[in-house]
């Protein structure tokens, strides 16, 4: 019988090698553009004027980061809410502290202007 550590090792190795195989297959099977005209920037059928590399401000970045933070909070809150009656007062106090830390982080992000559109 395989030990639990061996099963976890096999799981990670399988995931790693499947990822490598998929990347190699993607490289081998993807179309290759050999001609220079296929590498040119296409902009509404016209040749580009000026530099084609334009950097955009990432205004949505902070919103996405805050969303991911509170999405992960939901992942941690759900099992606690399902087993609320069984866990008792200690788990309740732990969750209040956890939510308090997250509210403190939200307040700090709000204070620093991370949630304001600029």
From Swiss-Prot:
Disulfide bonds: none annotated. GO terms for molecular function: NADH dehydrogenase (ubiquinone) activity; NADH:ubiquinone reductase (non-electrogenic) activity; quinone binding. It is found in: Cell membrane. It catalyses: a quinone + NADH + 5 H(+)(in) = a quinol + NAD(+) + 4 H(+)(out). Its EC number is 7.1.1.-. It comes from the Bacteria. It is an enzyme of class 7 (translocase). It is a multi-pass membrane protein. Gene3D superfamilies: NADH:ubiquinone/plastoquinone oxidoreductase, chain 3 (1.20.58.1610). One of its GO terms (cellular component) is NADH dehydrogenase complex. The keyword Ion transport does not apply. Keywords: Cell membrane, Membrane, NAD, Quinone, Translocase, Transmembrane, Transmembrane helix, Transport. The keyword Transport applies. Its main location: membrane. The chain crosses the membrane at residues 8-28, 61-81, 86-106. Belongs to the complex I subunit 3 family. NDH-1 shuttles electrons from NADH, via FMN and iron-sulfur (Fe-S) centers, to quinones in the respiratory chain. The immediate electron acceptor for the enzyme in this species is believed to be a menaquinone. Couples the redox reaction to proton translocation (for every two electrons transferred, four hydrogen ions are translocated across the cytoplasmic membrane), and thus conserves the redox energy in a proton gradient. NDH-1 is composed of 14 different subunits. Subunits NuoA, H, J, K, L, M, N constitute the membrane sector of the complex. This is NADH-quinone oxidoreductase subunit A. It comes from Carboxydothermus hydrogenoformans (strain ATCC BAA-161 / DSM 6008 / Z-2901). The lineage of its organism: Bacteria, Bacillati, Bacillota, Clostridia, Thermoanaerobacterales.
């Amino acid at each position: 019988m395989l030990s639990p550590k061996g099963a976890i090792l096999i799981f990670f190795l399988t995931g790693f090698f499947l990822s490598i195989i998929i990347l190699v297959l993607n490289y081998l099977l993807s179309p290759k553009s050999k001609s220079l005209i296929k590498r040119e920037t296409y902009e509404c059928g016209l040749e580009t004027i000026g530099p084609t590399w334009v950097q955009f401000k990432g205004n949505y970045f902070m919103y996405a980061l805050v969303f991911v933070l509170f999405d992960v909070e939901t992942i941690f809150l759900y099992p606690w809410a399902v087993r609320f009656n069984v866990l008792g007062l200690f788990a309740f106090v732990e969750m209040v502290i956890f939510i308090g830390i997250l509210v403190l982080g939200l307040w700090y992000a709000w204070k620093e202007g991370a949630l304001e559109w600029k």
